Amino acid sequence: MEAWAGAGGLLVNPYREIDMETRIFSKRDIEEAARVLKAGGLVAFPTETVYGLGGNGLSRDAARKIYAAKGRPSDNPLILHVSKIEEVNPLVESIPEKAKLLMESFWPGPLTLILKKSEIVPRESTGGLDTVALRCPDNALSLALIEKAGFPIAGPSANLSGSPSPTEASHVYHDLAGRIEGILDDGAVGIGVESTILDMSGDVPTLLRPGAITLEDLTEVLGEKPEVDPTLVGKKMEDGFIPKAPGMKYRHYAPKAEMILFCAVEEKGSEDKISKRIAEYLEEEGLKFLEEQIAILCAEETKHFYQEMAEKEGIILKVLGRRNEPLSMTHNLFRILRECDEEGIGLILSEGYSEEGIGFALMNRMKKAAGQKIILV
């Protein structure tokens, strides 16, 4: 069991090899956290989506440290966080009118825009690309940290590469204690999945990662529906694929357990179909998992389908949230996947949900967590 003491102290994890002490900052320590960043160190920071792993976005060395701390492939771009729209100007060649309109409509907020970078942005921060990913987070502490630091803060999710994203400071500590200088603790985040990413560097706005700013939201502001990158709708990546945004190329958000997603071809009657298929799967394949603890991820509205079976077979039920409140599911998803890791779950069977609105982001993360292991019903 790893120690966690919250804001205000130096913590050491005795169960991993440690190169440095990781200080836990509270909001009273914002000046000190900024000093660490100015000195070239790394500080995890809260946003409204997930916790980010912060470093100087204009420093080659800081970018390299971020990749090393996470174990992140160096061709996976970082997002630079700014505290206001005006800070974007020196970082890009130009700001297209439509991009400016999106900034004015959704910033601060969970929208990342990709634009052509200027010379001052090092390629170490962009995965070697001539574009840069930018956003202004909707979190008072992160905005204050950016202002105090005086430069854009590069910030991928503050977790080990490939594992579920951190939605609480304790999640960051679990993954990165001893690898970074500090964690700015602001409790649990609100949204729970990473920002929407829209590529505005070409002629046509293109969605690269779904998030809380939905396609419908973007369409309303732009007056046209953005294109959707083919990899988001099932197209396989070709050899040599170069990701323009985080979350595109590599397996992400994955628990240690095998995870299987059960999705309905048609929405009508999907709750009943999915629950019956999960029960059938356990009858057909259950003998393969006699030595494994099994968990079922379900909605509040459908947990009654599984309760008798769970009690009889010793299966753990994890309730993601309510089907008619998908934001409750995004808020809980990564926390629950981490709980499954902590509880030694070997197999996760999960319901699938509607991909309308923010459901597109929810299902994108769930499919990646399952490694695209999907059973259609």
Residue map of PLM features:
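Active-site-adjacent structural elements in enzyme catalytic cores
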Residues: 14-377
